Amino acid sequence: MAVQQNRKTRSKRGMRRSHDALSAAALSTDATTGEVHRRHHVSPDGFYRGKQVVEARDE
């Protein structure tokens, strides 16, 4: 099993953690329906780039 030989400093720990932050999802508003959805994803009502691509699910 791997065991470190020397203790990592606070600086090295911080450098490693600098990439762990989460970013907010990029949201768009559909031009035809006004539905808010994630960019480059189909909106919940089945539209993508102004065209109906799939049938909307009934919930």
UniProtKB/Swiss-Prot annotation:
Keywords: Ribonucleoprotein, Ribosomal protein. One of its GO terms (molecular function) is structural constituent of ribosome. Residues 1-59 are annotated as: Disordered. Residues 21-33 have a biased composition (Low complexity). GO terms for biological process: translation. It comes from the Bacteria. Residues 7-16 have a biased composition (Basic residues). Pfam families: Ribosomal_L32p. InterPro entries: Ribosomal_bL32, Ribosomal_bL32_bact, Ribosomal_zn-bd. Coiled coil: none annotated. SUPFAM superfamilies: Zn-binding ribosomal proteins. Belongs to the bacterial ribosomal protein bL32 family. This is Large ribosomal subunit protein bL32. It comes from Marinobacter nauticus (strain ATCC 700491 / DSM 11845 / VT8) (Marinobacter aquaeolei).
